[in-house]
């Protein structure tokens, strides 16, 4: 009996997490821009569950140092992120059918509000199951920030 309870509890937990993901998002540039802001805020809160709703199972990211990260690797790293926040600017979105992308600039701030990095990013999305999901991301570090 105990053997059956564990898988059932696990399935219910996964279903509850999936139920919290947004539904019926519009297929608009504005929706993608809002998603990027929500993603940045979730990273600042170290909220891996919120980010998990925003990235597709096959998500891959090319980091500023050129290393590649899968969805699970990226999500596992979120709780270990340094304290701080992300300030997104210069964002542009484009939607073509079920695909879209956002390009922008992320100013990474330390807890005092000082800019510690400037990162140009491009995120590619697909519209699936009534919501936008990131398929891929790429970041480029824009020079060193004086400390």
Where are these regions (language model features)?
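Bacterial N-terminal signal peptides
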Residues: 2-15
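A beta-strand edge to alpha-helix "cap/lid" segment located at domain peripheries
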Residues: 19-53, 58-147
